Amino acid sequence: MSTKAVRSIELARELGVKPLEIVKFIEKIRNIQFKKGTTNIKVEPDEIDKIIQHFKKEAKLEKIKEKEEKPVELKKTEEIKELEEKKPITPKIIEEEIKEEEELQLPGRFRREISFEKIEKIKPKPVPTKIPPKKFEPKKWLDIKEQKKVKDKNKKEEPAVTPSTAPRKKSIKIEEGTTVKEFAELIGQKVPDVIKKFMELGYMPTINQPVDIDAAQLVAESFGIKVEFSQTQELDIIEEVEDSPELLQPRPPIVTVMGHVDHGKTSLLDAIRKTKVTEQEAGGITQHIGAYKVTLQGKDITFLDTPGHEAFTALRARGAKVTDIVVLVVAADDGVMPQTIEAINHAKAANVPIVVAVNKIDKPEANPQRVRTQLSDYGVIPEEWGGQNIFVDISAKKRIGIENLLEMIALQAEIMELKANPNKPARGTIIESRLDKGRGPVATVIVQNGTLRIGDAFVAGVTYGKVRAIIDDTGKRINEAPPSTPVEVVGFEEVPQAGDSFTVVEDERIARQIANTRAQKKRLAEMQKAQRLTLQDLYEKIKEGEVKELNLVIKGDVQGSVEALKKAVEDITHPEIKVKVIHTGVGGITESDVNLAATANAIIIGFNVRPETKAQDLAEQLGVDIKLYSIIYEVIDDVKKALQGMLEPEIKERVIGRAEVRAVFKISKIGTVAGCYVLNGTISRASDGVRVIRDNIVVYEGKISSLKRFKEDVREVQAGYECGITIENFNDIKEGDILENYVLEKVPVKGL
């Protein structure tokens, strides 16, 4: 067995096969699908032996086939020889006829006099009269092409068309999403010529970029062609077809857990799944939607955990759209709170039944009856009081009443008779999305109808793609996902918006066409909206007397958090200043974000992300303020305080140095030592802290416990030198991580 990983190209060279064959075989082993055209991938040691055995077997089979075929070939050749001997034609004449060079030199008339059937097949009669002899001289393959062209001309009786001549089309039809290349083919012009025309109009398109309809009309008119615009019938392509009752099969219920912050939603799911989800959340608050599948008494139930803070209204509204049953968690000691009322309104708006879980009944101050009374005021009435809502008293912490709650959920699902057709293309909803460095754009999808399979082409909002991998809630790769299954999908062209519909279509071409159409419609709507806002703002400014605006750029680690943060800050009101979010995005803070903030005089807010080194330097040069947070409450509080002029003297962080981890050493009794190279500034042991940054996302923040150079303890290490660093209570350091060393300084407040 091999102990070392190799590249697929090297292995293919050794086995004498094509690299693509190796890649296809690895796809079968790993149960995944690589991007089209991938030939050079890493082959693990345990896969090498399987590949060698597979291709050796194929080679043996080929040899056996060759042996079996050989005697048949010999018989055929003998038969041919016998036939040739029986022919009345003398061998000498046959040899002269087969020689191509001599035959080509003979005049046409003489060749016809001694021609036999074989010669007539090789050279048809019209050829000698039409083609001059000089065309036979350079290369014989050119003669064949020329002869074919002559034949086509004789058949069609049309003059030859050169590439430079103008097209005969007087009008063409183009659809939304037509690329520059497709447009050039339609009007019969070369792509570079068409791009030049677009550039003259002030557009700078690429070959695969969709054309602007107005610009395309002007370009076509310059070539004497009229353009007719035909809209893509998107609704016809992805229209929902009602399934006949015999095709429908029972599906698991999708249950959304809702409730006020700290009332125990995640703890309830934790009790069901017997895992420690709560401890992993920043500040004990759920930051992203989680989707889990639980099997109870042989039946599956899919749970969605929506964040409980009121800032996550948008997320919870999306959760209500995809759910079948809402479990409303209310703490027995706190009672009904603002977010509880909000959750009730979302569930009622979506016409979803509510099962109430009265949590924390183990506490001395718990009063479950008070909760029932309060909820009845909002139309959620217990069954025992003559209402339609099931109430269950539970304690998620002590696992009291959990089994009873699950039985009630299963009972509610049975009453609803939930069904779907698994034998059709999948449809679903994007629950969460993010940009993964290794896998590209990925999204959590709830499949609501049909079955999602690897290789399916799909549309999701204004983006599209092809399913390359499907990962279930346990992290396992699967081939297909039936209805009511939460999965992570890899294969998006761009990061989709959370809440977008996910629809499988016939092929990638249709998917791209629909996505481009939607993108163009969205772009036009935004342009019109921007124009309306400009006029309104102008009127408001005249009326209110130059109202100031606080412009913000928000970047986060996932789309859901960014949307929630945007809504939260935009809801903050102030009599003199308006809060306006001018840009949002997923991923680290880039130079583009800094330039935008500088132009709009905006502040950048980073939520669980870090700025790139170049972006940080540019921000310092341009004087752009970057604020970094990990908990949403802090962002809201800081913005409110800044608007009210109540900010306390600020303790500002100053980054004094950055180091790159180039090697990792594990030493007993000490832990993990990071072998680092100081990129810039100074790494100091006396600093206030150090951050471990992986792919522009903070994975840990703590203090340096030791700093060494050549086995000697040192106070600091300058840029350009190597050193060994250990971090307090953290051993999960990896090669390529960036260690950011900082100090805290008191800075006079200027306002946010």
From Swiss-Prot:
Renumbered residue ranges of the record's region G2: 284-288
InterPro entries in the cross-refs: EF-G-like_DII, EFTu-like_2, IF2_II, IF2_N, P-loop_NTPase, Small_GTP-bd, T_Tr_GTP-bd_dom, TF_IF2_bacterial-like
Residue ranges, annotated region (Disordered): 148-170
Residue ranges occupied by any tr-type G domain in the UniProt entry: 250-419
GO molecular function ontology, one term from the record: translation initiation factor activity
Compositional bias per record (Basic and acidic residues), positions renumbered to this chain: 148-159
Coiled-coil regions listed: none
Keywords: Cytoplasm, GTP-binding, Initiation factor, Nucleotide-binding, Protein biosynthesis
GO BP terms, alphabetized: translational initiation
Any one GO CC term of the record: cytoplasm
Localisation per UniProt entry: Cytoplasm
Span list, region G3: 305-308
Residue segments, region G1: 259-266
Region feature (G4): 359-362
Positions with a binding annotation for GTP: 259-266, 305-309, 359-362
Top-level division of the source organism's lineage: Bacteria
Region named G5: 395-397
Role description: One of the essential components for the initiation of protein synthesis. Protects formylmethionyl-tRNA from spontaneous hydrolysis and promotes its binding to the 30S ribosomal subunits. Also involved in the hydrolysis of GTP during the formation of the 70S ribosomal complex.
Similarity section: Belongs to the TRAFAC class translation factor GTPase superfamily. Classic translation factor GTPase family. IF-2 subfamily.
Protein name, per record: Translation initiation factor IF-2
Naturally occurring in which organism (per UniProt): Thermodesulfovibrio yellowstonii (strain ATCC 51303 / DSM 11347 / YP87)
